[in-house]
Amino acid sequence: THTACLSYEVLTGPPDRREQRARRLPEVSVINRENIAWLISFWGDDWPYDMVAVDEMSSFKSPTKRNKPTKKVIEDRTNEIVRALPRGLSSAEIEQKVTRELKKVRGELTRFGALCTVRKFISRFIGLTGTPAPNGLLDIWSQYYLLDQGRRLGTSFAGYRTRYFDGDYMGYKYTLKGGAFEKIVHQIEDITVSMRTEDFTDMPPLVYNTIKVRLPKKVMEQYKKFEKTMLLEEHDIEAVNAGVLTGKLLQLANGSVYDEEGQPIEIHDLKLDALERVIEEAAGAPVLVAYSYQFDLEKLRKRFKNAEVVGEAKNVVKRWNNGEVPILLAHPQSAGHGLNLQYGGCITVWYGLCWSLEYYQQLNKRLHRPGQTSTVFVHHIVAEGTADERVMRVLPEKNATQSALIDATAWVAET
């Protein structure tokens, strides 16, 4: 290929191996996202790379530069502060000084924050993603900041949000102002190229299907009461707020609910039964199954003894692509980016649904990608009358803005 003449190193493995390979300064250094902060810390102001290309750029969509300090960091720093205080202080004085010092404690840099510290040393920055705005155009600010250091969309996320969005009275939900979409596209179109796979490759069809399951009357009554009162009395489970309630309702739709101690309470097996029918109808064809919760995984492995899990064995992807894995279980968050699974099967089943459009689309594309020769089927097992149906409504709504952005910046091949 055209890159065969270049020298390269893969900066993975133990820190000493990474350091040794990094010091060789090949023409191309390849690193995973998890080690970016390490690489930046290693080089500091001696950063040697004048060009950076980031695959799956949307994984840098969070505009937060630092994570919140962990509980352990806070506890350790509190102990250090108290030990350093002079004797004889009152409890109120100690509390005041500790509070003041803790305000200075900062969490670790995020991926975005880490790259920001060395961006000034980079003359060319390229980002690639198939999901640039999975939750709307608020997602793109940090990605474009890394590309142009704020020249097009501004140097602060708050400023970008104020210029182009209107917030609700609580500041939780933001919607585009009139004409804002066109203004944003105008700002970024000179450095943005969108290419749809179907415009450049002959891809087989992608077919979406919904498989509905109906909860038994007693379970549905429990669900509705839980939804209304935020209390599942039969199992002494309480949802402390609307966000927790939504998660608990999705758990119940899947078949179990975590109690206050984090132990799963089994409610039903309807989704397992529906999945079993899909696998039987597949007549031996491999099936990729997306699950949501740990109890999902445990129930799936108990029901399907021949199932294997992405990430548990180093060669599981290779064996899947060789047709040696009949059922592959994957969590969307860990299997959504970068995996090539198109050679092993053409059936995906969403056993547990997810709110993230990015994870949803990325996992669907594990099978429907160049190299696939068969029609790809994506089945969704949906419990009727539950939060599952809400997820199925929300995902297309999220995709509308992203598709409009891709269309507005699309480059179509000449025919």
Describe each model-derived feature in a short phrase.
Residues N32, K61, L297, A307-V394, ...:
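Conserved RecA-like P-loop NTPase helicase motor core
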Residues S59-E80, A92, Q96-C116, L357:
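Substrate-gripping "pore-loop 1 plus following alpha2 helix"
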Residues P286-Y293:
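Conserved RecA-like ASCE P-loop NTPase motor core of nucleic-acid helicases/translocases
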Residues V30-P48, V73-I74, T78, G107-S123, ...:
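Inter-lobe coupling linker of SF2 helicases/translocases
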